[in-house]
Curated annotation (Swiss-Prot):
Gene source species: Homo sapiens (Human)
Domain CARD: 15-105
Effect of residue 56 to K: Abolishes activation of NF-kappa-B. Abolishes interaction with RIPK2
Effect of residue 788 to S: No effect on association with cell membrane. Reduced binding to gamma-D-glutamyl-meso-diaminopimelic acid (iE-DAP)
Protein name in UniProt: Nucleotide-binding oligomerization domain-containing protein 1
Record text about domains: The LRR repeats recognize and bind gamma-D-glutamyl-meso-diaminopimelic acid (iE-DAP).
Impact noted for substituting residue 818 to S: Reduced binding to gamma-D-glutamyl-meso-diaminopimelic acid (iE-DAP)
Phylogenetic placement of the source organism: Eukaryota, Metazoa, Chordata, Craniata, Vertebrata
Its job: Pattern recognition receptor (PRR) that detects bacterial peptidoglycan fragments and other danger signals and thus participates in both innate and adaptive immune responses. Specifically recognizes and binds gamma-D-glutamyl-meso-diaminopimelic acid (iE-DAP), a dipeptide present in peptidoglycan of Gram-negative bacteria. Preferentially binds iE-DAP in tripeptide-containing muropeptides (MurNAc-TriDAP or TriDAP). Ligand binding triggers oligomerization that facilitates the binding and subsequent activation of the proximal adapter receptor-interacting RIPK2.
Effect of residue 952 to S: Strongly reduced palmitoylation and localization to the cell membrane
Alphabetized GO MF terms: ATP binding; CARD domain binding; cysteine-type endopeptidase activator activity involved in apoptotic process; identical protein binding; pattern recognition receptor activity; peptidoglycan binding; protein homodimerization activity; protein-containing complex binding
Positions annotated as LRR repeat: 632-656, 702-725, 727-750, 755-778, 783-806, 839-862, 867-891, 895-918, 923-946
SMART domains hit by this protein: LRR_RI
UniProt keyword Lipid biosynthesis present: no
S-palmitoyl cysteine lipid attachment residues: 558, 567, 952
């Protein structure tokens, strides 16, 4: 065998030579690669192998290589035990002596039990910094930020995962994520291998910041096993605090503005540059940057020592120009776009499902009786349930429930009427204003909401002033001077609505503040616009300027350009919908509509002069009506068969939300009249279950029958319940990709069978099981005009398949059934075969990807010999073989109606293909037989090049 050498010098195995000899023979290798001598000296002293005098001798050496040589001399002079311990140190302190890992593995060093019993103290700067970061993040992530500062809620006690979905570049679903650890998994959901950034998006309040806080906690406590040694967490809004002229190098950004190493920062930074893959960065809230930052057009800065503006450093970290290989997690609200070349994967947070909500109730209220009371009240009020699908709003409502329990002697009662988001925020404001009052052991606080808000008017005005000043500039962090200028007192700060930041501002010498959540800042901004009678019409309506037709909205921007990057605005094409990235304005408009609604006048007339209130209400309603009319007229329209279809944008969802906050039937009627179409398409609008309340509020005024397409949103079962007022008008209902379970299908069954007018029902890619399939069967049986049924990619097995097939068999109207991606198997296929036999109307059937094998396939083929209606049959991705191909060939000799037969990705060979091709000689009706992905070799497929109806590749 050829002898293998070492790059430095020949290695003498330790098992055949004393440890002293091993050190002597590899002396220059050790001198070259040992850079940290202090850690060695510390441990040799700790275990009494070195004396103080030995340590002084080492320290007196002028250069690092000299120190290493002196240590080696001293160690070897002290004998075999010390030499073995020296090697043990190199093995145990892996970060400090990372370059020696291959050598230690190659020599097969294995310490004795005596050596392993010795204490090793890790004073290596890199390891110390890792521990320092763990302590820092552990402290910051232990408690959840809470409204009331005197309360501290443990993250471990209240955190709960939400629905996490992997999505593609266009937000199409790629499947669910089951745990936070999967976020950093390098094998699932990868969109771009070259991308550096994992992008987490979701609506305000859906839990993006909490998710990052949970990740911090897991890493700090050693429960996130992802090979991460450095964890840097930044909130993007803090980058807005830097001045235009500020310049930092990467080391200063990480150390001076996050966590400074206790020892040898240069060595720590050098390790980070050399091994960037051991670092994890999280950047929370890209949408909260006070800049029209176009990440794809920021100047490159690939040198870690070159000073640059912090925003340039941020952009280059995300792109991988700086610290390429480090993991980066970036969060933003839905609507923010990040250049595709930056993205490694995208994750969409969808909030709480009904099962999440029940689990969260158990977490927040351990007492079973209390859980049952809360859940029964929520079930009785689907409007509240819908609000609770957003974790932040759920938490607020649950906190109010706790308050009612304490305030009303253990008999908590949530409101049983319709609640808007404005109601929720008014409620939490009232709760916390009351909690600041002195408590009495003998008398409950019985102040009315009017009295509570009147007593806290000055505090509300001061909070509103701070919020409004920030909102005008899209700023979310405030200096101490700005807070003091508003007149806020120390007792006001105890409410917890405005809180001190854990980190100091960029100057490092003054405290900064922020609102508990962006939605809270929007609420107090709206409150300020209502309370301050000096606010004129233009200022009142400022944030509505985005309610313009898409073509007009793209011409201006509320954001001042970020001066260092004039190219960020550029002269390129205008944005399609500038408003989509500015939810903080949208929430302000929403709360303004709620506060100025007729229902809130009794509450506000003691806070605002009557004349000012009338003036503001009049101005708001006039603007709301005209904006709504103009926007609806501008929406793109298209004629689809007998429908006049209008394609609405996400801005329309915000308009509906604002209309719902008014609770004005007049406004709802106006909106319904303005739609001027009988097919409303709201796909990919990121609508949640609470939005169904707003949609129903408008659509129940629609005078005619309507087609409604809500595919690819986030409605879940609560959203289906909220749509109940609309069902009497809906002929087309598309709810695919919406997290709907059997409970939601039950509601559909009950409601749609009341009116029996539905012709199209789309429920593709939900969470429907055999139980839900039976509810769909009822719809098929009783809705005699139903022509299209889409149930693909659910969880329906042969049992549910049999029920559905029987209903299809009995239907005289059904023309298209989609069952792709279920698991009906051979038994289900046989049932559908019976349905096909002599069916009068079914033209399209998809049983693709259903686990169908020989028996099921042959049954379908035999049935089609007695069918003259079916034109399209999809059997892609099953387990069909040549036996099935033979049966299908026999069928084709008889059936002249079938036009498209898809057998892609099955187990058919050249033999089965030949039989199908022969059958075409006597069939003039079929236009294609697709056999791509079967067991057919390219040379075998060449035989059929002239037969264009056989498609093999």
């Amino acid at each position: 065998m050829e002898e293998q050498g070492h790059s430095e010098m020949e290695i003498i195995p330790s098992e055949s030579h004393p440890h002293i000899q091993l050190l002597k023979s590899n002396r220059e290798l050790l001198v070259t690669h040992i850079r940290n001598t202090q850690c060695l000296v510390d441990n040799l002293l700790k275990n009494d192998y070195f004396s103080a005098e030995d340590a002084e001798i080492v320290c007196a050496c002028p250069t690092q290589p000299d120190k290493v040589r002196k240590i080696l001399d001293l160690v070897q002079s002290k004998g075999e035990e010390v030499s073995e311990f020296f090697l043990y140190l190199l093995q145990q302190l892996a970060d400090a002596y990372v370059d020696l890992r291959p050598w230690l593995l190659e020599i097969g060093f294995s310490p004795s039990l005596l050596t392993q019993s010795k204490v090793v103290v890790n004073t290596d700067p890199v390891s110390r910094y890792t521990q320092q970061l763990r302590h820092h993040l552990g402290r910051d992530s232990k408690f959840v930020l809470c409204y009331a500062q005197k309360e501290e809620l443990l993250l471990e006690e209240i955190y709960m995962d939400t629905i996490m979905e992997l999505v593609g570049f266009s937000n199409e679903s790629l499947g669910s994520l089951n745990s936070l650890a999967c976020l950093l998994d390098h094998t699932t959901g990868i969109l771009n291998e070259q991308g550096e950034t994992i992008f987490i998006l979701g609506d305000a309040g859906v839990g993006k910041s909490m998710l990052l806080q949970r990740l911090q906690s897991l890493w700090a406590t050693g429960r996130l096993d992802a090979g991460v040694k450095f964890f840097f967490h930044f909130r993007c809004r803090m980058f807005s605090c830097f001045k235009e002229s500020d310049r930092l190098c990467l080391q200063d950004l990480l150390f001076k503005h996050y966590c400074y190493p206790e020892r040898d920062p240069e060595e720590v930074f050098a390790f980070l540059l050399r091994f960037p893959h051991v670092a994890l960065f999280t950047f929370d809230g890209l949408d909260e940057l006070h800049s029209d930052l176009d990440l794809s057009r920021v100047p490159d800065s690939s040198c870690p020592w070159e000073p640059a503006h912090p925003l340039v450093l941020l952009a280059n970290l995300l792109s991988g120009k700086l610290l390429k290989g480090a993991s980066k997690l970036l969060t933003a609200r839905t609507g923010i776009e990040v250049p595709r070349q930056f993205l490694r994967k995208k994750v969409l947070l969808r909030g709480f499902s009904p099962s999440h909500l029940r689990a969260y109730a158990r977490r927040m209220f351990p007492e079973r009786a209390l859980q049952d009371r809360l859940l029964s009240q929520l079930e009785a009020n689907p409007n509240l349930c819908s609000l609770c699908s957003v974790p932040l709003f759920c938490w607020i409502i649950f906190r109010c429930f706790q308050h009612f329990r304490a305030a009303f002697e253990g008999s908590p009662q949530l409101p049983d009427c319709t609640m808007t988001l404005t109601d929720v925020f008014l409620l939490v404001t009232e709760v916390h204003l009351n909690r600041m009052q002195p408590s009495s052991l003998v008398q409950r606080n019985t102040r009315s909401p009017v009295e509570t808000l009147h007593a806290g008017r000055d505090t509300l005005c001061s909070l509103g002033q701070v919020a409004h000043r920030g909102m005008e500039k899209s700023l979310f962090v405030f200096t101490q001077e700005e807070v003091q200028a508003s007149g806020l007192q120390e007792r006001d700060m105890q409410l917890g609505f405005l809180r001190a930041l854990p980190e100091l501002g960029p100057g490092g010498d003054q405290q900064s503040y922020e609102f508990f959540h962006l939605t809270l800042q929007a609420f107090f901004t709206a409150f300020f616009l209502v309370l301050d009678d000096r606010v004129g019409t233009q200022e009142l309506l400022r944030f509505f300027q985005e309610w313009m037709p898409p073509a007009g909205a793209a011409t201006t921007s509320c954001y001042p350009p970020f001066l260092p990057f004039q190219c960020l605005q550029g002269s390129g094409p205008a944005r399609e919908d500038l408003f989509k990235n500015k939810d903080h304005f949208q929430f302000t408009n929403l709360f303004l509509c709620g506060l100025l609604s007729k229902a809130k006048q009794k509450l506000l007339r003691h806070l605002v002069p009557a004349a000012a209130l009338r003036r503001k209400r009049k101005a708001l309603w006039a603007h709301l009506f005209s904006s709504l009319r103009g926007y609806l007229k501008s929406l793109p329209r298209v004629q689809v068969e007998s429908f006049n279809q209008v394609q609405a944008m996400p801005t329309f969802i915000w308009m509906l939300r604002c209309i719902y906050e008014t609770q004005s039937q007049k406004v709802g009627q106006l909106a319904a009249r303005g739609i001027c179409a009988n097919y409303l398409k709201l796909t990919y609008c990121n609508a949640c279950s609470a939005d169904c309340s707003a949609l129903s509020f408008v659509l129940h005024h629609f005078p005619k029958r309507l087609a409604l397409d809500l595919d690819n949103n986030n409605l879940n079962d609560y959203g289906v319940r909220e749509l109940q007022p609309c069902f009497s008008r809906l002929t087309v209902l598309r709810l695919s990709v919406n997290q709907i379970t059997d409970g939601g299908v039950k509601v559909l069954s009950e409601e749609l069978t009341k009116y029996k007018i539905v012709t199209y029902l789309g429920l593709y890619n939900n969470q429907i099981t055999d139980v839900g399939a039976r509810y769909v069967t009822k719809i098929l049986d009783e809705c005699k005009g139903l022509t299209h049924l889409k149930l693909g990619k659910n969880k329906i097995t042969s049992e549910g398949g049999k029920y559905l097939a029987l209903a299809v068999k009995n239907s005289k109207s059904i023309s298209e059934v989609g069952m792709w991606g279920n698991q009906v198997g051979d038994e289900g296929a046989k049932a559908f075969a019976e349905a096909l036999r002599n069916h009068p109307s079914l033209t399209t059937l998809s049983l693709a990807s259903n686990g169908i094998s020989t028996e099921g396939g042959k049954s379908l083929a035999r049935a089609l010999q007695q069918n003259t209606s079916l034109e399209i049959l999809w059997l892609t991705q099953n387990e069909l073989n040549d036996e099935v191909a033979e049966s299908l060939a026999e069928m084709l000799k008889v059936n002249q109606t079938l036009k498209h037969l898809w057998l892609i990705q099955n187990q058919i060979t050249a033999k089965g293909t030949a039989q199908l091709a022969d059958a075409l000689q006597s069939n003039t009706g079929i236009t294609e037989i697709c056999l791509n992905g079967n067991l057919i070799k390219p040379e075998e497929a060449k035989v059929y090049e002239d037969e264009k109806r056989i498609i093999c590749f």
